[in-house]
């Protein structure tokens, strides 16, 4: 049965296998987050065959790097590792709230309703532009212990999951921007090049 993010979070809180790491910035994050123009961001990620302690430690290092960069989501390809692994935390202020770890995520359904919302990305710092996405999704994935899970998400959580899952296919949010003038201005203002955007229909 699909559960909400809150239900999954409560279940994680009640177990010993949470992925809690301090939600504070480190002087030197364990992983480098690659930025627009890096070829590693355009490569597809591979499914993870077996979830191991090495997988969990990668997720922890991703969280440490994400918190240091003050982000709410990070995909393994952003740190140069082409595995289907995402970490998300929409509650950065609450140290006790566990993050969400998604391994081999697959969207099984998306709402017909769509909305437009401003997105940013740790791989394109400073750039914020509107992107259209389905309002709600249903997905299946494995958690940090390798257990199969199902989940329904809407609002910011649905958008964040879709954004991070794009990274697994070498797609960045700027590829989905339809405001060409705004895109060119934002990229130029923050030192990025339009030629590194690969627009998708």
From Swiss-Prot:
Entry EC no(s): 3.5.1.88
> How is the cofactor bound, in the record's words?
Binds 1 Fe(2+) ion.
Q: Name one GO molecular function term.
A: peptide deformylase activity
Q: Which UniProt keywords apply?
A: Hydrolase, Iron, Metal-binding, Protein biosynthesis
Is the keyword Amino-acid biosynthesis assigned to this protein?
A: no
Q: Where is the active site?
A: 164
Top-rank EC class of the record's enzyme: hydrolase
* Catalytic reactions on record: N-terminal N-formyl-L-methionyl-[peptide] + H2O = N-terminal L-methionyl-[peptide] + formate
Q: Which NCBIfam families match?
A: pept_deformyl, PRK00150.1-3
Name the record gives this protein: Peptide deformylase
What organism is listed for this UniProt entry? Parasynechococcus marenigrum (strain WH8102)
